[in-house]
Amino acid sequence: MSFNLRNAIMANIQGSSQQEVEATIVDAMESGEEKMLPGLGVLFEVYWKHADESQKDELCAEISKGLNE
């Protein structure tokens, strides 16, 4: 028996409103708990799959800027 964490997270967050997604992200960031990282990764993956090239470029630039401050 194998457990697919990505699918479990998607099943848990599917159908979430914009406000619920934001609350999930804020909660994960404020709690600082490492157990929240896979969920943030799945949310990032969803964003990436739906973003156009300019959105991806902008996001990567912002992340890079934040990593180099």
Swiss-Prot record:
Pfam families: SSPI (PF14098). It is found in: Spore core. Its main location: other. Induction: Expressed only in the forespore compartment of sporulating cells. One of its GO terms (biological process) is sporulation resulting in formation of a cellular spore. It comes from the Bacteria. Keywords: Sporulation. HAMAP family: SspI (MF_00669). Belongs to the SspI family. NCBIfam families: SASP_sspI. This is Small, acid-soluble spore protein I.
